[in-house]
Structures are given as C-alpha cells and as structure tokens.
Amino acid sequence: MKIAVLSRNPRLYSTRRLVEAGERRGHQMVVIDTLRAYMNIASHKPQIHYRGRPLEGFDAVIPRIGASVTFYGCAVLRQFEMMGVFPLNESVAISRSRDKLRSLQLLSRKGIGLPVTGFAHSPDDIPDLIAMVGGAPLVIKLLEGTQGIGVVLCETQKAAESVIEAFMGMEQNIMVQEYIQEAGGADIRCFVVGEKVIAAMKRQAKPGEFRSNLHRGGTASLIKITPEERMTAIRAAKVMGLNVAGVDILRSNHGPLVMEVNSSPGLEGIETTTGKDVAGIIIEYLEKNAEHGLTRTRGKG
C-alpha cells in the first residue's frame, strides 16, 4: 500500500516508528507536512497538492495532527477522504475529540463514567459551579489546553473562586471538575486500536505534582487493567468514532472515570513502557481495514 503520514516533523518518535513499521511490512510510506499541503476545494475531482505536485495513488492516510493545527489538519484529512483515501482516524472524529466539552457531553450521554464536571460563563454563577462539583479541592481546566498545560488544582474554595474569576476575566473557556483524590496523582493510558486495548500503562505524577502527563515529568510503568477499565476504554473510543485512541482513565472509588480521549496518542511512552510494537499493530490494522472510499462516520454528535 501507499500510505501518507500527516506530520509536521518526520523526526518525531511516533512518525519515525510508523514509517519504519510500514516500510518493514513492504508499504510505501510518505510523510507529508500537514501545513504545506494545499487544495482546490471546488475542483470537480478532489485533489491535494504538495510542494508543487498533486498527491496521487494513496491507499490510506495516518493523521498525526497536533492540537495547534487541528482546523487545517482536519481540512487536509477531509480532502483525502473526498479522494477516497482510507483514514486511520476520520476528520470528524478528530475534531469531535479535540473539543473537550463536546467529548464529555457525548461520553456522558452513553453512560461512560466521568468526573463530575461543571461549565459556566457568568462570574455570578461561580459559587454554584463550585458547589456543583462538590466543592474544593477541585480541578480547573482550560478547554484549549494540552499536555497538562492550563490545568490547575485548587485546594480551597477561595483559591478556586480566584482562579475561575481570573480565567473568566481573560475570556478563556474553562471547565471545573471534581478532584479524584483516591487516584493519587496517577492515571491509566489505554491504547485502543480497532476496538481492542492493545497496551496500557500507568502514569504517575512526580512528587508535589498532580498532573501525570509524561511531558510534565510523570513516570510510566506497566499495569494490569481490569475488565471494567478495558471495556470503558473501548466504549469511549467507539463513542468518539476513533479507530485508534489513547484513553486516559482514573481509578476512583466508584469505578473507572474517563479523563480524556486522545485522537493522536504518542507512541514513545507506551512502546518504551510495554515493549509492544504499537506502530506495527497500527499498520496491521490498516492492512486489514483500508478500503478505497470507505469513510464511515462512526460515533454521533
């Protein structure tokens, strides 16, 4: 197969591994800088141009679209879909998963466990908003934040009010969530490929920190997940319509709670921790499922 990898940087671990895994299995792998692809939208025959030439003959496309280029990246991916190229994850599923609030609304509708979450616009509603999630300590999250940036733990009511007021004053969209103390600064990253959890790791925040992101100095270790956690991760990816997803789960006193569903999960942490050839499993999934013109919009909303 001829497989496109949409990535800003061919030297990134995840991009490199996907290219290696594809080439090892006899496929032609082409890395395309997402922001350098351009399109004639109204042309009768959909096309994408790159460095002065049309992109042709692709069987599948692997989107590795960073959060900051979601809008343009999804437009390029949509154009590939119009050309009948099979996407590892569909554009509509990626844009759905990048909207944190929309994601939680969809997961909630399907009865998937979530931390109690509040959202408001007016500063007048701050006391009610805090009460809604059970009071302090609580977590405040910027809706546009990634990799733990824009996530604040407020240990007192006063601190929570001040931080929420500050964010609202800057006209930033935030959500307020209950703090799951019993998780002890740890979460579980479940790597889902084609309705199976193919690998899982526990991420533990460094001492004095509550965010477990590896980018923030967290450490990763092997973990045995429960059948309920496995089912939760698979269902969450399915609701979002993602074939490949990193589902982040907290262990709480009332079962697994989904924190986030990531449509472009990094491979380095999960491969290094588990020793699994995740890139190879992704290429295998494409071999079994990539059919020309097969873009089914999975998930609803």
Curated annotation (Swiss-Prot):
Annotated residues for binding of Mg(2+) 1: 248, 260
Chain residues that bind Mn(2+) 1: 248, 260
A GO CC term assigned to this protein in UniProt: cytoplasm
Top-level taxon in the UniProt lineage: Bacteria
ATP-grasp domain boundaries: 104-287
PROSITE patterns the record matches: ATP_GRASP (PS50975)
Chain sites annotated for binding Mn(2+) 2: 260, 262
GO biological process, alphabetically ordered: protein modification process; SOS response; translation
Keyword Cell division: no
Co-factor remark: Binds 2 magnesium or manganese ions per subunit.
Keyword list, A-Z: ATP-binding, Ligase, Magnesium, Manganese, Metal-binding, Nucleotide-binding, Protein biosynthesis
Annotated binding of Mg(2+) 2, by residue: 260, 262
EC class of the enzyme, as a word: ligase
Name of a matching Pfam family: RimK
MF terms (GO), sorted A to Z: ATP binding; metal ion binding; ribosomal S6-glutamic acid ligase activity
Cofactor(s), by name: Mg(2+); Mn(2+)
The EC number(s) this enzyme carries: 6.3.2.-
Positions annotated to bind ATP: 141, 178-179, 187, 211-213
Family recorded in the similarity comment: Belongs to the RimK family.
PANTHER family found in the cross-reference section: RIBOSOMAL PROTEIN BS6--L-GLUTAMATE LIGASE (PTHR21621:SF7), RIBOSOMAL PROTEIN S6 MODIFICATION PROTEIN (PTHR21621)
Name this polypeptide is given: Probable alpha-L-glutamate ligase
Protein species of origin: Azotobacter vinelandii (strain DJ / ATCC BAA-1303)
Gene that this polypeptide is encoded by: rimK
